[in-house]
Amino acid sequence: MRRKRSRSAAAAAAIALLCGAATAGGGNPIAAADDSLAAQGFRTQADGSRIVDTTVLDERNLRLQVYSAAMGRTIDIDVQRPADASSPRPTLYLLAGAGGGEDTATWQQRTTVLQFLAGKDVNVVQPVGGAFTYYTDWRSADPALGVNKWQTFLTEELPPLIDRALGTNGTNAIAGLSMSGTSVLQLPIAAPGLYRAAAAYSGCAQISDPVGYNFVRTVVSAGGGDTANMYGPQGDPLWAANDPYLNAEGLRGLELFLSTGSGIPGQWDTLDGPYTLPGVGGLANQLTVGGALEAASNYCTHNMQARLNQLGIPATFDFQPVGTHSWGYWEDALVASWPILAKGLDLPA
């Protein structure tokens, strides 16, 4: 028990140092860590979740290890601190695609958006994990993907820990691409008031119709998972219950941005380009698989536009005439979405 307590105290002190936790008279921040906002993040919550460790990567970045009681395992959380952390700042939850940030297909490795966001007064929080899960609560454990209660983790367990550890102002936005382009619409519906803005890049909101269902099944099966363990067989009521298109009323009041390409090759679809996998095979995959996925996303996003218009819910839609399901277009989309996210976060555009 003493060893565990010491580890948590050291980790709390590390966050206190990075987050600029002040001490009276310029005293030792390690000695004061238990009284700091950072240390509070290490207190076990009523649900059993807690921050168990942290690694400071540099003066702006750290990795937290957060125990999820709902899933019974520890999740890595990458954090980029604001340009100015002298006062409480808002938080942008930035989700990965199908790989869950566990592979090389990450915002850090494929884009420069972290550098772009480094100039903003916002905490950027990226969960590492959840590959092929849609960041949702699965109805049962999956033989390949295990126990998944990502909705519970992202909406109930993680935010209060982040708020206490980083001393945020409690204002949140969420953004994601491809697989998580669906999740970032589901999560605000599931947790009203948690987020003020959401941006979905190349997602598919309409998951319970045949096109959307097959889109989800294709992604989940790529990781060896079975969607029957997620929401049940096709037509099960859980599919409709988790469909952002059908439940779009829950998005009212949010600042919304949705974007997609057409599936037709564009400027970032070039041989050995900066956003293309190496070689002819990499480009061919981007043009064929990436083209088909983006065309499906385009279909879903147009339908979502019609749905929001029907409900009188304002949103910004960015339909590009070209573009495949690939990183160059997602980087462009995130930059384009920043004014919308910033408005929700009460930050300058």
Residue ranges, per PLM feature:
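Non-catalytic cap/lid and distal C-terminal segments of serine-dependent acyl enzymes
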Residues: R2-A13, C19-A349
